[in-house]
Amino acid sequence: TTPQPQVKVTRPEIQLTPETPIAVKHIQFVGGTVYPLKELLEPFRPYAQKTVPLKTIITLVNAITARYQADGYPLSYAWLPDNNFQDGNIRIVLVEGYVAHSDIQSDNNGTAARLKRLTEKIMAEKPLRQETFERNSILMTRPPGSKVDANAQLPKNSYGAGGMKVKATQPHIWDISSTL
């Protein structure tokens, strides 16, 4: 038998622009516990069963993110996943961020243990609120002679798990009397 030539046909991907018309037939929110579904749907109601530019949908989704931020959820946001808008179905993913793991760096065991306890308080809250992060971050900076830098990264997954880095440095204190 002779090998048959193989033909591979690839469909060109549709390039979306802000002006791309999007049919709005059904809105599906994936995830999210902070806001009632009815409240999330309300801004979309005027566009139901209509065709609108993509930029209108993006503006509404960005407004959800802005609401999370204004309500004190710094790691939470809304986004439109790829492979969306088929047959007028619009999926909006609500990522309610929290700290799932931490990386604590300190050259002092006592400071590291204290930072771990405070980080665990941050990790216990889902989704993380700004006030919880700030309160515990401020407490992290309390040990005299230590400089602490704590930051949490936005989650890069749909279930909201993010990371936090905490670095404590202590300047070397020289006791001149012991060197004489």
Describe the predicted segments one by one.
Residues 1-180:
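Periplasmic polypeptide-binding modules associated with outer-membrane biogenesis and secretion
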